Amino acid sequence: MEEKKQQNVTIKGTKDGITLHLDDCCSFSELLIELDEKLSTHYYDGDGRSLIEVHVKVGNRYLTEVQQEEIRTLIRNKKNLVVDSIKSDVITKAEAIAWKEETEIVPISKIVRSGQVLHVKGNLLLIGDVNPGGTVIAGGNIFVVGSLRGIAHAGYYGDSDAVIAASVMNPMQLRISDVAMRAPEEKEDGAEAAECAYINENNHIVVDRLQLLTHLRPNLTKLERGIV
């Protein structure tokens, strides 16, 4: 009995076009040959008037930029096919390091004094105060276990879901992504309590009770593992 040939390329039609699942165990040259054969069989060159979007998934295979371009060129040569995306489950070491820096919690114990700027790529956990004139900046969230009386900028790289939380919230300015808020009104003596700031549905920064944070941003509970 003849052994059934392993299928290295699987084509699935979707409402958005077609998805190509490419095997991650065979050689790249074998993959290209079978991909060309499959596309030639299932999709003819046609007149090129109706473009079909192609989503390519390569599993646990790392593709260089040159290899990605080879796949794009092969598919593009079918005239009515255009590559929308090529997705791999594998990332480079540089990408992994960048992801870690952007998502980790950086604990720092200090007082940020006037004129000083503290900047981290990920989430900042500051154990200490931010004095008037001091600035803290984070690519993610900012948590201040102390008094925030200076400037805080969370979501520095464009994350509008970032939040700012402090034991005592009395800042000169709050900024989340590209949205800014001037200092809120002075609180009455003894009225200071832990608060959080976030961007609401109207794209305005709102300062509210810290207890609301888990409801507003439920994914923040995943960060607990980085703290404890």
Swiss-Prot record:
Pfam families: MinC_C, MinC_N_1. Belongs to the MinC family. The keyword Cell division applies. Interacts with MinD and FtsZ. GO terms for biological process: cell morphogenesis; division septum assembly; regulation of cell septum assembly. Keywords: Cell cycle, Cell division, Septation. This is Probable septum site-determining protein MinC. SUPFAM superfamilies: Cell-division inhibitor MinC, C-terminal domain. NCBIfam families: minC (TIGR01222). It comes from the Bacteria. Cell division inhibitor that blocks the formation of polar Z ring septums. Rapidly oscillates between the poles of the cell to destabilize FtsZ filaments that have formed before they mature into polar Z rings. Prevents FtsZ polymerization. It comes from Bacillus cereus (strain G9842). Signal peptide: none annotated. The keyword Glycoprotein does not apply.
